[in-house]
Amino acid sequence: MKAYLTLLKPRVIWLLILASAAGYVYAAGGVDWGKLSSLLLAALLATGGSAAFNHYWERDIDAAMRRTSRRPLPMGLIKPGRALAFSLALSAAGVALGFLLLGPLPGAFVALGWFFYAVVYTMWLKRRSWLNVLAGGFAGNAVFLGGYALGKGHIDLAAVLMSFAVYLWIPAHIWSLAYKYKEDYRRAGVPMLPVVIGEQKAVVVISVLNVASVAYIALLTLLFLPSLLSLLLVAVGAGAAVASSIYALVKRTEGAMWKMYKSSAPVLTIFLVAVMLA
């Protein structure tokens, strides 16, 4: 059972599920626990299914990388065929429940989130281009927009702008992690940004992108979450992230980049919590 739970990548998908909940609560202006429960269930199944499919599709990559070599498929804990069946069953259930329980528009965003991660990122671009993360990041937009559509019944400019807080955070976060494990990715033949453009250029790009994503989140907070509590929460997280980014840009060492990764990781969570409290 533990091996199958690992396939869901709980440390990854919980943030996407939180994004869907934040979109719903903000748009609805309150909580209908029946709707929220249905949203969380559909999001859990769809994101978990896409994560499990990623485990199946990338089992050869995982086996070649030290960081991922102890995952269930490389370790032989789950047969590939069973992992595939498990992933497709979860995915189908999540998308179906999205349409049946949430409605056409939220359901479409649930399906789009699955598609961008499982197909665009995992199947199409992961092994082909460093743009993989930029394209796959639209899964983050989709989960937020799905929740927002459920809460308000439609999508507006505020929804789109706020969804890009998730999108912009994703590449800075993933590329910071990829910087630490760049030799793993190079050995596995995966064209992540630090592998493609080199270490020094990668430090500049990732640090600047991290500052830009944090600045964007701060701007959204000023525009849409003008409460003192929201401003204080985001200010604390943003300050730490910007300071660590500047430190990484100056030092340009693996240790400094790892500090930036750790410091910036909570920023999106803080923002999404602030969205729910608005």
Curated annotation (Swiss-Prot):
Pfam family, one: UbiA
KW Membrane (keyword) present: yes
Gene Ontology terms: biological process: heme O biosynthetic process
Enzyme type, top EC level: transferase
Pathway terms, separated by semicolons: Porphyrin-containing compound metabolism; heme O biosynthesis; heme O from protoheme: step 1/1
GO cellular component: plasma membrane
E.C. no: 2.5.1.141
Record's bilayer topology term: Multi-pass membrane protein
Membrane-spanning ranges: 12-32, 33-53, 78-100, 105-124, 130-150, 157-177, 202-224, 228-250, 257-277
Chief localization: membrane
Keywords from the named record: Cell membrane, Heme biosynthesis, Membrane, Transferase, Transmembrane, Transmembrane helix
GO molecular function terms noted in the UniProt entry: protoheme IX farnesyltransferase activity
Catalytic activity: heme b + (2E,6E)-farnesyl diphosphate + H2O = Fe(II)-heme o + diphosphate
KW Transmembrane (keyword) present: yes
Protein's cellular compartments: Cell membrane
Family designation: Belongs to the UbiA prenyltransferase family. Protoheme IX farnesyltransferase subfamily.
Stated role: Converts heme B (protoheme IX) to heme O by substitution of the vinyl group on carbon 2 of heme B porphyrin ring with a hydroxyethyl farnesyl side group.
Note: Carbon 2 of the heme B porphyrin ring is defined according to the Fischer nomenclature.
Protein name: Protoheme IX farnesyltransferase 1
Species: Pyrobaculum calidifontis (strain DSM 21063 / JCM 11548 / VA1)
